[in-house]
């Protein structure tokens, strides 16, 4: 009679042991310490506090020692995305409300990450142009409230600058890494491609946010750095030196550009009453209580409404900004995302999240169609429809008159690649994961020739060296 009971007990013991073993082996920190001798997984949380909304990027990484020698020591297996609106800058008068706005995102992260992994999951929040444009005290008050919420989230946030305002140039660098990692232009698991990154295989990244726009690429001809001093970022990527050309143009984001263009068309006396007039909207149309940078505006259409008039003002604004001519990229496909993609999607230039290839002239053609619409046609309830003429005209002028691409310039519009968002989030996730590994002990990889070395140098981490602002990997150090 004791044998059946003993059998049940033995089966239960081995079932429990199997669960514990699976938990330990599946997660890199399954038993509370780092286990990296087998394929394992871990999470990193990045919160993008943009000018128009706050976005959760929850990345599930997989580390596979068997393929580490073919490229990345770990890579993103899955991304979970969620967005809340408005952006943090909208809570300038109530910083605590800014912190409260994060709660749906934190709750989603807590739901997706197993509880025993919370303290082993690094979290970071980076604010962008929306907070950069606020007066210093307001931005600081919001960040202080948000930082407290992040630090009490249950996730790991005990490293420097876990919550801060990200420099625009960092957005560009991280976006470039995300794009090229997803496209596998830097490293790939295919041995026939080769593991040495090369400029000619990489692609240029153009990001259009609400307050700023960024461009980043790896030039084949380094003479461009002499022509545009201060736009260089030197990095060491997996032991390979890369000189990136990158810059962020504050005030040239889509929403900021709207206000700048409208102000060019409006007399100062009228503007002082918070009224703006634009030829980018039809006569008789009024958009009331439009908010930007803590101010409200009433916008009125004009009798001179046309693509030609709208383009004339937009071109003046673009040419007065610091956007530069990029000769090397002429004729080569460049990747555009964020608002570039959104407005192309609204106009039917691309279908769905997969994006597609177009030529620059198609933005002009879409703008001409949008600028012919009458008052009744643009008042359909879509938040973007009244702005479509101006937005498309600005995008065309930015690329044509700013970067001076020809109308036949090939453009690749992207929102997701391999089911993951094209943004700076994934690039930052690698850096954040590295900071955490420095704290916990780095994942080992066959990439190093030293048997006792780690991959501290294999996972990029933003480290600024002197005035050159060098983005580098840590050199290999012994355990």
From Swiss-Prot:
Biological process terms from the Gene Ontology for this record are:
GDP metabolic process; UDP metabolic process
- Where along the chain is the active site annotated? 171 (proton acceptor)
Spans through the membrane: 8-24
As recorded in UniProt, its EC number(s) are 3.6.1.6
Report the enzyme's class at the first EC level.
Answer: hydrolase
A Pfam family per the record:
GDA1_CD39
- Matches recorded under InterPro entries: GDA1_CD39_NTPase
Question: Which is an annotated GO molecular function term of this record?
Answer: GDP phosphatase activity
Tell me the Gene3D superfamilies matching this sequence: 3.30.420.40, Exopolyphosphatase. Domain 2
Q: Which residues are glycosylated?
A: 300, 452
Major place of residence: membrane
Which cofactors, if any, are listed as required? Ca(2+); Mg(2+); Mn(2+)
Can you name a GO cellular component term?
endomembrane system
For membrane topology, the record states: Single-pass type II membrane protein
Compartment annotation: Endomembrane system
| Segments on the Cytoplasmic side according to the record's topology features | 1-7
Per UniProt, which keywords does this protein have?
A: Calcium, Glycoprotein, Hydrolase, Magnesium, Membrane, Metal-binding, Signal-anchor, Stress response, Transmembrane, Transmembrane helix
Task: Describe activity versus pH.
Answer: Optimum pH is 8.0 for UDP and 7.5 for GDP.
Q: What induces it?
A: By stress such as high temperature or ethanol.
What reaction is this protein's catalytic activity? a ribonucleoside 5'-diphosphate + H2O = a ribonucleoside 5'-phosphate + phosphate + H(+)
Check the record and name the CDD domains matching this protein.
ASKHA_NBD_NTPDase5-like
- Lumenal side of membrane: 25-479
| The family this protein is said to belong to | Belongs to the GDA1/CD39 NTPase family.
* Name by which UniProt lists this protein: Nucleoside-diphosphatase uda-1
Q: What is the native source organism of this protein?
A: Caenorhabditis elegans
User: Gene for this protein?
Assistant: uda-1
């Amino acid at each position: 009679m004791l044998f059946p009971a003993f059998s049940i007990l033995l089966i239960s013991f081995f079932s429990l042991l199997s669960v514990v073993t699976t938990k330990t082996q599946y997660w890199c920190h399954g038993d509370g310490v780092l286990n990296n001798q087998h394929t394992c997984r871990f999470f990193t949380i990045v919160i993008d506090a943009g000018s128009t909304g706050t976005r959760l990027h929850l990345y599930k990484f997989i580390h596979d020692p068997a393929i580490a020698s073919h490229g990345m020591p770990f890579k993103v297996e899955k991304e979970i995305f969620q967005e809340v609106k408005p952006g943090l800058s909208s809570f300038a008068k109530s910083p605590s409300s800014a912190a409260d706005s994060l709660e749906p995102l934190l709750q989603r992260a807590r739901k997706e990450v197993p509880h025993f992994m919370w303290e082993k999951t690094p979290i970071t929040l980076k604010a962008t142009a929306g907070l950069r444009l606020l007066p210093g005290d307001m931005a600081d008050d919001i960040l202080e409230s948000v930082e407290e919420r992040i630090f009490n989230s249950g996730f790991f946030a005990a490293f420097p600058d876990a919550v801060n305002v990200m420099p625009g140039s960092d957005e560009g660098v991280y976006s470039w890494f995300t794009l090229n990692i997803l496209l596998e232009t830097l490293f790939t698991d295919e041995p026939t491609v080769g593991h040495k990154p090369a400029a000619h295989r990489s692609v240029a990244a153009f990001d259009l946010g609400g307050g700023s726009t960024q461009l980043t690429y790896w030039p084949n001809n380094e003479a461009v750095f002499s022509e545009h001093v201060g736009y260089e970022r030197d990095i060491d990527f997996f032991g390979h030196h890369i000189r990136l050309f990158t810059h962020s143009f504050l005030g040239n984001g889509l929403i900021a550009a709207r206000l700048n263009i409208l102000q060019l068309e409006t007399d100062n006396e009228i503007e002082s009453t918070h009224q703006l007039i634009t030829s980018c909207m039809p006569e008789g149309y009024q958009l009331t209580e439009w908010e930007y940078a803590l101010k409200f505006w009433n916008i009125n259409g004009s009798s001179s409404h046309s693509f030609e008039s709208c383009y004339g003002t937009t071109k003046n604004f673009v040419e007065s900004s610091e956007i530069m001519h990029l000769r090397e990229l002429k004729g080569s496909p460049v990747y555009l995302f964020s608002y570039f993609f959104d407005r192309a999607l609204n106009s039917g230039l691309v279908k769905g999240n997969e994006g597609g290839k177009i030529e620059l002239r198609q933005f002009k053609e879409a703008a001409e169609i949008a600028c012919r619409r009458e008052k009744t046609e643009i008042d359909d309830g879509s938040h973007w429809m009244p702005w479509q003429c101006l937005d498309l005209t600005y995008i065309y002028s930015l690329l044509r008159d700013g970067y001076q691409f020809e109308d036949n310039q090939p453009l690749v519009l992207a929102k997701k690649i391999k089911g993951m968002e094209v943004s700076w989030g994934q690039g930052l996730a690698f850096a954040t994961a590295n900071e955490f590994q420095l704290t916990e002990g780095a994942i080992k990889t066959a990439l190093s020739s030293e048997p006792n070395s780690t991959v501290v140098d294999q996972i990029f981490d933003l480290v600024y060296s002197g005035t050159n602002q060098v983005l580098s990997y840590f050199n290999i150090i012994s355990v």
